[in-house]
């Protein structure tokens, strides 16, 4: 089974405000609200939405086998195999292809992690029309030790000290995945921002964005090894270069 393609960074003016904890600005406290779908359409499973009536990740701390899927076109999302769709997973997100990790399989169906609120939300999508690949890599973040480890075939390929969320704006724990690769349109604190499919649990919004958690660089090395962010994970320049080569959909496991 081939691996998913490495994402080419997309230049977006919104990159700097999409994610939480990425510099100056403020957030709005709370637990998020459901984004209404226009005209009664099903809500889209994106980083901007909150989805109702879908199951939570059954094993939020377990390792995944690296199987990831990409819908060739918008896929219906159900709470159970064969149940009516309650959301839709678009084929593209943030100007790039949607790749999501598989957490469970049944005949004709794949249960996948979704990039929406609440954190750890999952849904079942039909396996017809899916491109399937396998990522041999995984990313682990230990919030307590404030370290990030890149795994290749289950073995550490690099470990770095990182900055994580402050006590009042912690980095959320659980399983998620690499969602996108964004290059800010204007010079900012990081040449690359790598959003994941998780959000701040304490901020509804941050800097005009939906409070998406991301990996990104930082101009000062003094922050590494500290709990000082609004939820994002600030990484050293060498780590960011390595993470930039990781395919979209690659599992990310964040532990306390």
Sequence positions of predicted segments:
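Bacterial N-terminal signal peptides that target proteins for export
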Residues: 1-10
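C-terminal motif of bacterial Sec signal peptides marking the signal peptidase cleavage site
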Residues: 18-21
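Bacterial signal peptide processing site
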Residues: 23-26
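Boundary regions of SH3-family modules and the immediately adjacent low-complexity/disordered segments
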Residues: 32-62, 114-141
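Beta-loop motif signature
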Residues: 39-101
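A mature extracytoplasmic/lumenal domain signature
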Residues: 81, 106, 114-118, 129, ...
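SH3/SH3-like beta-barrel superfamily modules
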Residues: 88-128
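Exported/periplasmic cell-wall-interacting domains
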Residues: 116, 129-138, 170-175, 185-256
């Amino acid at each position: 089974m081939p691996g998913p393609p490495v994402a080419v960074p997309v230049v977006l003016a919104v990159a700097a405000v999409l994610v939480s904890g990425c510099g100056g600005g403020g957030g709005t406290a709370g637990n998020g609200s459901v984004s209404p779908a226009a005209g009664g359409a099903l809500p889209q499973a994106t980083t901007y939405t909150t989805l109702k009536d879908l199951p939570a990740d059954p094993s939020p701390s377990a390792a995944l086998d690296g199987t990831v899927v990409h819908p060739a076109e918008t896929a219906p999302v159900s709470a159970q195999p064969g149940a009516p769709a309650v959301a839709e997973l678009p084929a593209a997100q943030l100007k790039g292809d949607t790749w999501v990790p598989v957490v469970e399989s049944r005949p004709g169906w794949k249960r996948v992690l979704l990039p929406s609120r609440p954190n750890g939300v999952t849904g079942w999508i039909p396996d017809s029309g899916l491109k399937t690949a396998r990522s041999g890599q995984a990313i682990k973040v230990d919030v307590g030790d404030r370290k990030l480890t890149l795994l290749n075939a289950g073995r550490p390929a690099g470990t770095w000290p990182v900055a994580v969320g402050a006590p009042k704006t912690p980095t959320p724990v659980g399983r998620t995945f690499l969602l996108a690769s964004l290059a800010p349109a204007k010079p900012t604190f990081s040449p690359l921002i790598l959003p994941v499919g998780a959000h701040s649990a304490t901020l509804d919004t941050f800097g005009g964005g939906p409070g998406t958690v991301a990996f990104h660089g930082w101009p000062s090395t003094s922050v590494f090894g500290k709990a000082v962010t609004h939820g994002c994970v600030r990484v050293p320049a060498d780590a960011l270069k390595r993470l930039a080569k990781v395919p979209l959909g690659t599992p990310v496991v964040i532990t306390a």
